[in-house]
């Protein structure tokens, strides 16, 4: 089968690789000059299935109000003048209940754990290298309230049989020796030993090369203007003056997926702006050995070979990609507070990207009401974590195979009204 994939981020490239491995003739189209040059370029570097959780959580609405008055707040909201933003935020608020949180986190952990398994198999099969580490993730708590609040997440981990360790301040140095100097600032930590790390952009670039070796064609620097429709199906992709035709089409355009298929269905994927800095390591003993997540600031600090990646925060501000100095200050403050002297933040590069987020946090992977149109988008802050599993899952669906995990509740149909022939999602 001929398959066209729109988008060459980590999710699009993973989809291409697994489809090609299944025997399909695959073409990837992207407006950029190469793979992983937008959202996948400089993310936090975590592959953290156990920490897969929606931003829509109990208590978040009240926290959001409090964060409005904090200098280093992890969340910021500025109205972008669109009705869609208001609809999306309303839908997100409706998911901030304990019941919805448990359902959504369960879906996310299921896909993320499967994706980690797919990544490990890929690594074993191909030997792909991407400055990866398998030292686990350590979530750090600065208050007793945060430590107590981890109970709801631990319950989900236990249900999913995800191994974990609850560490006291004195025990944190077992996972991250450099934290011994700052353990007095912390009340404890939750460690997931099965989590991994790696440079997402490097991985995507090397996976694209592997996909090419399987026959995948990459068309970079190519405009993606519209989908051509005929007889209720997709008939091609309009790329400038050319129409590219296939049997099946995959939209993996991240935050741009919503507007691209708005004439067919209203997919609730909104850009969640995040930031990162990447600093050179200057003192090995003071640097992290794997990755930590600061629960207070929602910031991840990840070790690459000779670099530290610090990323996080969320701004609901539309497609604004302006680099804000205050956000860099927050990232530098966090890493220098936990790992003082480990990296030289004065020499760090500064980046921002738009994560494609759904109101419930769960990505949209699978079929649509249009028979030959598939989606692989909406992974939010977990595109790297979920990429391989999402790619394999989509390849199975397109190939007519039974997926290895439950997939029905990951499709766009969960957002569609229960009306025959209806292709527009319900926001209320």
Swiss-Prot record:
Keyword Oxidoreductase included in the entry's annotation: yes
Keywords: FAD, Flavoprotein, Oxidoreductase
Highest taxon, organism lineage: Bacteria
Reactions catalysed according to its record: a D-alpha-amino acid + A + H2O = a 2-oxocarboxylate + AH2 + NH4(+)
Protein name as annotated: D-amino acid dehydrogenase
Any one Gene Ontology molecular-function term assigned to this protein's record: D-amino-acid dehydrogenase activity
Swiss-Prot/TrEMBL GO biological process terms: D-alanine catabolic process
Annotated EC: 1.4.99.-
Residues that coordinate or bind FAD: 3-17
Function: Oxidative deamination of D-amino acids.
Pathway(s) this gene product operates in, as recorded in its UniProt entry: Amino-acid degradation; D-alanine degradation; NH(3) and pyruvate from D-alanine: step 1/1
Required co-factors: FAD
A Gene Ontology cellular-component term: plasma membrane
Keyword Lipid metabolism: no
SUPFAM superfamilies recorded: FAD-linked reductases, C-terminal domain, FAD/NAD(P)-binding domain
Classification via InterPro entries: DadA, FAD-dep_OxRdtase, FAD/NAD-bd_sf
Family, similarity comment: Belongs to the DadA oxidoreductase family.
């Amino acid at each position: 089968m001929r398959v066209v994939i729109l988008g060459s981020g980590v999710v699009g490239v993973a989809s291409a690789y697994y489809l090609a491995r299944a025997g399909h003739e695959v073409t990837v189209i992207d407006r950029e000059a190469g793979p992983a040059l937008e959202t996948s370029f400089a993310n936090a570097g975590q592959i953290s299935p156990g920490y897969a959780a929606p931003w829509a959580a109990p208590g978040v609405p009240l926290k959001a109000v409090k964060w409005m008055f904090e200098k280093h707040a992890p969340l910021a909201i500025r109205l972008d003048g669109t009705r869609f933003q208001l609809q999306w935020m309303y839908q997100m608020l409706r998911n901030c209940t304990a019941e919805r949180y448990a359902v959504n986190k369960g879906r996310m952990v299921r896909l993320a754990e499967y994706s980690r398994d797919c990544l490990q198999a890929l690594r074993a099969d191909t030997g792909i290298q991407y400055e990866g580490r398998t030292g686990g993730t350590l979530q750090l708590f600065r208050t007793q309230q945060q430590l107590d609040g981890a109970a709801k997440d631990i319950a989900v981990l236990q249900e999913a049989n995800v191994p974990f360790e609850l560490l006291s301040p004195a025990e944190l140095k077992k996972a991250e020796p450099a934290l011994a100097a700052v353990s007095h600032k912390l009340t404890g930590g939750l460690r997931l030993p099965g989590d991994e790390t790696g440079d997402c952009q490097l991985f995507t670039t090397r996976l694209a090369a592997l996909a090419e070796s399987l026959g995948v064609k990459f068309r970079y620097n190519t405009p993606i203007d519209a989908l051509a429709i005929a007889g209720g199906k997709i008939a091609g992709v309009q790329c400038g003056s050319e129409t590219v035709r296939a049997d099946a089409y995959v939209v993996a355009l991240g935050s741009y997926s919503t507007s691209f298929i708005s004439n067919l269905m209203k997919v609730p994927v909104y850009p969640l702006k995040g930031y990162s800095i990447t600093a050179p390591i200057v003192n090995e003993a003071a640097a992290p050995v794997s990755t930590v997540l600061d629960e207070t600031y929602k910031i991840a600090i990840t070790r690459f070979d000779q670099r530290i990646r610090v990323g996080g925060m969320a701004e609901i501000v539309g497609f604004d990609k302006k680099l804000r100095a205050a956000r860099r200050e927050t990232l530098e403050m966090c890493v220098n507070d936990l790992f003082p002297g480990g990296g030289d933040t004065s020499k760090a590069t500064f980046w921002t990207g738009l994560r494609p987020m759904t109101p419930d946090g769960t990505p949209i992977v699978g079929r649509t009401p249009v028979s030959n149109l598939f989606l692989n988008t909406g992974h939010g802050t977990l595109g790297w974590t979920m990429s391989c599993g999402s790619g394999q899952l989509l390849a199975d669906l397109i190939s007519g195979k039974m997926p290895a995990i439950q997939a029905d509740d990951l499709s766009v149909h969960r957002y569609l009204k229960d009306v025959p022939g209806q292709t527009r999602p319900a926001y209320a």
